[in-house]
C-alpha cells in the first residue's frame, strides 16, 4: 500500500498519517527525516546534501528522489509506505513517476484556509515541555497557563496568523496543482484518488479512511 498525503499545513495530515502507519504497518517517509539520517550516516547522497545545505542552498529534487529510492528499497517498505511532504511540486511528482514508483492511493485532506488559520492561531504551547493546547479544542485548565507547571503558554511563531497565511500561499501556488495532477493520474492509471473532509472529528476522518482503503 503506497500512499501519498496531500493537504495544506494544519489540515490534519500528521494525525491521520500516524493512524495509517499504525493501522496498516507501513512506515511514514518524511524527506526531512531522511535528509537528517543520510547526513548523519555519511552516505554519498548525505554528503552531497550536507554540502548544499552548508552552502545555504536548497537540496535538489535529484538528491531527494535518490534518497527516496534508497529508502523505499529497505525491508520495512516491503508492504508499502506513506509519503508525507513529498512531492510538493509537479516536477517532483514527475520525478517519482520516472523513477518507476507506483502509487496506490493519493489522499487529500480538504480544509478551508480560514478554518486552518483558526485551528493554528488557537494553538498555545508550553515551550519547556513541548505540551500543546488549543483555546477551543483542547483548552488548558486555567487560561494561558500550562496544566502541569502553571507557567505561561505562548503562541509559537509558526502558528501566528500572518505566518500561517504565508505558508498557505506557498501551498496553493506550489502544491495545490498536484491535486489536479493526481486526479488526472487516477483517471488514467491504477492510482486511486481519495478526498476527505478534514474539518470532521479526527476519529471520523480515520474511520472514513479505513472504509475507503478496505
From Swiss-Prot:
Q: What is this protein called?
A: Adenylate kinase
Locate the residues binding AMP: 31, 36, 57-59, 85-88, 92, 156, 167
- SUPFAM superfamilies on file: P-loop containing nucleoside triphosphate hydrolases
Where in this protein does the record put region NMP?
30-59
Q: Does the keyword Plastid apply?
A: no
Pathway connected to this protein: Purine metabolism; AMP biosynthesis via salvage pathway; AMP from ADP: step 1/1
Q: Where in the cell is it found?
A: Cytoplasm
Q: Oligomeric state and partners? A: Monomer.
The family database entries (HAMAP family) matched by this protein are listed as:
Adenylate_kinase_Adk
Family as reported in the entry's similarity comment: Belongs to the adenylate kinase family.
Q: Which PANTHER family does this chain map to?
A: NUCLEOTIDE KINASE
Q: Which reaction does it catalyse?
A: AMP + ATP = 2 ADP
